[in-house]
Each structure stands twice: as structure tokens, then as C-alpha cells.
Amino acid sequence: MTNIRKTHPLMKIINSSFIDLPAPSNISSWWNFGSLLGICLVIQILTGLFLAMHYTSDTVTAFSSVTHICRDVNYGWLIRYLHANGASMFFICLFLHVGRGLYYGSYMFMETWNIGVLLLFAVMATAFMGYVLPWGQMSFWGATVITNLLSAIPYIGSDLVQWIWGGFSVDKATLTRFFAFHFILPFVIAALAGVHLLFLHETGSNNPSGLSSDADKIPFHPYYTIKDILGALILILVLTCLVLFSPDLLGDPDNYTPANPLNTPPHIKPEWYFLFAYAILRSIPNKLGGVLALVLSILILAFIPLLHTSKQRSMMFRPFSQCLFWVLVADLLTLTWIGGQPVEHPFIIIGQLASILYFLLLLVIMPITSLFENNLLKW
């Protein structure tokens, strides 16, 4: 008799995705982040669901409802901090996952990569709206500043901003709709992740060498299930340590002050995972130019497959490209640091140089270096 997992309509989908899936025998721990992102999403949906049971999306009671969750709800503080720090873990995994894709040429799977870029935008939008919900000072002013950027769009800009606000400023209507979108988007993300996997399984996984691994495949279970469990345990350990020992390490103290439209905080800045994009936005003196640079800083990922000039897929055997990749990583860390600094000398010029270098590396230097490497190998 054939095993039920191979015949049952539902079971065979799971079987072909997580059990009998042929996987390359040489994929490293950098391939763990897909499953870790899935775990992060499940953690965020579950903790978010329990938070939504006690949260009220009204400007008068939003801040005190979060206080109520932390003080009066059984383990409410734990749920709240798991959710807040879970977002940080989500973005750490996301950045590492995207970095892995860039390094090993996984972007050559065009459909998978483009859905991944779409997922990145969706997660960033969700995180931004979630940050507004506690209705602290940084929530309110962050929402005001970022939504106001849309007014830079010619002709329709100011109407668009008022349409998003649901009034003439960030107020009750804005908070209510942000809560609604923040609740629904994770389910859209889950559906998109399913499509992401669907396209990945059409081609099979890439591997560190960037060469075809069709001749050497192993079943996903038990080899990679056990490997993913190890990754999951490390993720949960780090998240638990963060939540239990220093839950506010990555947060902003200003968000413990209730939102006050009459009092602007001295330094308005987003959560740490948006700082690199915020630094790029601030490095351009023109408003519309800044908004375009902000969008392009992420959208540029969609053009990476078109900029691939190397005859090799992975950077594993390309030392010059490897050096440039790590320069790009250092540049992004510099931008993250600058995004959290006040707008004054010397931070302005450092931010501008780092922003120029970011776009130059991806659009010009790396493609030219790839051509140079082809030439070295007489390809």
C-alpha cells in the first residue's frame, strides 16, 4: 500500500514541500533563513492576535491599552515584548536571507526573487504601521513624517496624504485604518510566502557553488528538517534572551511618552531596521528626490538580475566581487548608524557619501567588476 503522505491531497503537498523534496547536498546554514522567517511570521501572527484581543485602536485609549496589556494581562508584557522584538528578529533574518541571495546569485530565479522583493515591501509596510499603534511620541511623529513624504508626489501628493490620514492630520481615523491594515497584511504575507515557495520548488534550491546540483540531491527530511530545527532553537534562544533580559534594547524611550501633537521630539527616527533607508532619504536635500531614493534603495533589488554580468552565478569563486559585497555590507551598516544620528556635521556628509556608494556599488562597480573577472578567466 502506498504511504498516505503520498496519496492524500493535502498531505502530498506537504510531502513534496517538506519531506520528499530533493535538496542539494551542500547547502550551508545560510539556507536556514527561509524556514526561520516562516517561524518569525508564525510568532508575529500568534502574539499579534493575542495583543489585538486587548488593544483598542482609539487615540484616547491606545496608549493606555498597551499599558494595560503590560501591567494587567497575564503574561501580557511577555506577549508584547515577544511581538516587538520578534519584529527585530524578523528583519535580521530578512536582511541575512536577502544578503545570501545576493552573494550566491539566487536572484537568477527571477519569479522567486521578485516575489521576495514584494514580500520585503509588505513586511516593511506592516512593521511601519505596527510601530504607529502604541500611540507614543515616536509612533505619532514617525507616522506624520513618513506619510507626509507622499506629499512630494507632483499634483496628487497633498490629496493622497489627506486620503491616507482620513483627515487633515494623523488622528483617530489614521490609527484605526493602520490597525486594520496591520492585522490583515501578515496573512497576505503568508499567502505571498506560499507563492514564493511554489516558484522556488519549480526550480529547486540554489547552492553555494552556484552550479547545478541535479546530479547530487538528498531528501529534505531528515537532513534539513533537523538542520532547520537547530536554526529555530538558536532563533528562539536569542529572541527569549532579548525579551527577558533587555526588552527595550532596540526600542526608543520616546515611545513611552504618550503622543502629543503639540510637542515634537528632538530626533524623529524610525526603528533600527529602517535606519539605512532613512539615512538615504535624508541625504538628499530635495523632498521628491529623497522619496525616490528611499523607494529605489529597496526597489533596486528587483533590478539585480538584470545587472548580473558574470558568467558565474555565485560569488564563491569571485574574490573581487566578494570584497565588493562586504564593502556593501559595511556601507549598509554605516547608513544604519548615520540614520540614528542628528542632522549635523559630519554626519550629513558621511550619509551622503554612503548613499552614493550604495547605489554606485550595485549599479556600476559590481557589474563592471564581474566583467573584469570574466576577462581574467578569458570568458
Swiss-Prot record:
GO terms for biological process: mitochondrial electron transport, ubiquinol to cytochrome c. A ubiquinone binds at residue 201. Keywords: Electron transport, Heme, Iron, Membrane, Metal-binding, Mitochondrion, Mitochondrion inner membrane, Respiratory chain, Transmembrane, Transmembrane helix, Transport, Ubiquinone. The chain crosses the membrane at residues 33-53, 77-98, 113-133, 178-198, 226-246, 288-308, 320-340, 347-367. Its cofactor is heme b. Binds 2 heme b groups non-covalently. It is found in: Mitochondrion inner membrane. Heme b b566 binds at residues 97, 196. InterPro entries: Cyt_b/b6_C, Cyt_b/b6_C_sf, Cyt_b/b6_N, Cytb/b6-like_sf, Cytochrome_b, Cytochrome_b_C_euk/bac, Cytochrome_b_N_euk/bac, Di-haem_cyt_TM. The cytochrome bc1 complex contains 11 subunits: 3 respiratory subunits (MT-CYB, CYC1 and UQCRFS1), 2 core proteins (UQCRC1 and UQCRC2) and 6 low-molecular weight proteins (UQCRH/QCR6, UQCRB/QCR7, UQCRQ/QCR8, UQCR10/QCR9, UQCR11/QCR10 and a cleavage product of UQCRFS1). This cytochrome bc1 complex then forms a dimer. Heme 1 (or BL or b562) is low-potential and absorbs at about 562 nm, and heme 2 (or BH or b566) is high-potential and absorbs at about 566 nm. This is Cytochrome b. It comes from Blarina brevicauda (Northern short-tailed shrew). The gene is MT-CYB.
